[in-house]
């Protein structure tokens, strides 16, 4: 049986069962554990499956992003840990971008005492928080308003970002995998691509609960990021997959 045939069978089994063990796959195709692992790694690189401990599962699909209010209550400890680690990378006097989201809001909460900082954001909550609690210079992108996430999206926001020179961009996502970050909202893609082009350094900040999920629009491949910051809940298989792509991964320890 050639690799293409094996991988098709794997996809069919995963589609039927949701999650399949490596033992099941080796028995079904009468091949070695190592052969199956190579097939699974190839499929994961394509974004077709997600490796889990001892097996493989289909990637979860994000049909829509939760509202800001809902996201605030999710993975709070992990986001705080990521925010603290990300903030430690910021230098006084720099110009940074904080993408819309509750993980990036956690970064802002650790930056309120930093001197001579300029923060660019498309997020109204982040801008409002920094306005009340810091002395930093705040630049808001403006643009079409996304009510659910209290942020600006679309071409107007993207055009504004292209006019800036950003030292560090901290970019968030509702879903990520070895293929990259994705979103169910097309109007968010142009903003993320614009800030990636405008920034000297790009940092993905995303908690491990979102890993292995996919949405309709691929916003940025992981190769666009200089660093990825996540929490210690990331599966070992995911860490190995990211290491194979020679990606810089920083793990924030949950306190």
What positions do the PLM features span?
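N-terminal active-site wall of soluble small-molecule enzyme domains
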Residues: 104-106
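Conserved phosphate- and dinucleotide-binding cores of soluble alpha/beta proteins
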Residues: 2-14, 18-24, 30, 44-45, ...
């Amino acid at each position: 049986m050639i690799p293409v045939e094996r991988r098709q069978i794997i996809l069919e089994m995963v589609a039927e069962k949701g999650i399949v063990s490596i033992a099941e796959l080796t028995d079904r195709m009468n091949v070695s554990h190592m052969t199956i692992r190579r097939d699974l790694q190839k499929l994961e690189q394509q974004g077709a499956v997600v490796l889990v401990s001892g097996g493989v599962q289909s990637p979860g699909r994000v049909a829509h992003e939760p509202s800001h209010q809902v996201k605030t209550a999710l993975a709070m400890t992990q986001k705080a840990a990521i925010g603290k680690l990300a903030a430690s990378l910021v230098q006084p006097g720099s110009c940074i971008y904080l993408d819309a989201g509750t993980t990036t809001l956690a970064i802002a909460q650790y930056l309120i005492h930093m001197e001579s900082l300029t923060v660019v954001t498309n997020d109204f909550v982040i801008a409002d928080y920094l306005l009340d609690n810091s002395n930093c210079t705040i630049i808001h992108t403006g643009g079409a308003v996304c009510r659910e996430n209290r942020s600006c999206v679309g071409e107007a926001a993207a055009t504004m970002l292209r006019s800036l020179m950003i030292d560090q961009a901290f970019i968030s996502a509702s879903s990520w995998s070895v293929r990259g970050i994705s979103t169910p909202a097309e109007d968010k893609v142009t903003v993320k691509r614009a800030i990636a082009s405008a920034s000297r350094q790009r940092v993905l900040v995303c908690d491990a609960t979102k890993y292995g999920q996919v949405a309709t629009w691929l916003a940025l491949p992981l190769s666009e990021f200089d660093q990825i910051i996540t929490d210690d809940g990331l599966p070992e298989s995911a860490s190995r997959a990211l290491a194979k792509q020679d990606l810089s991964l920083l793990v924030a320890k949950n306190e």
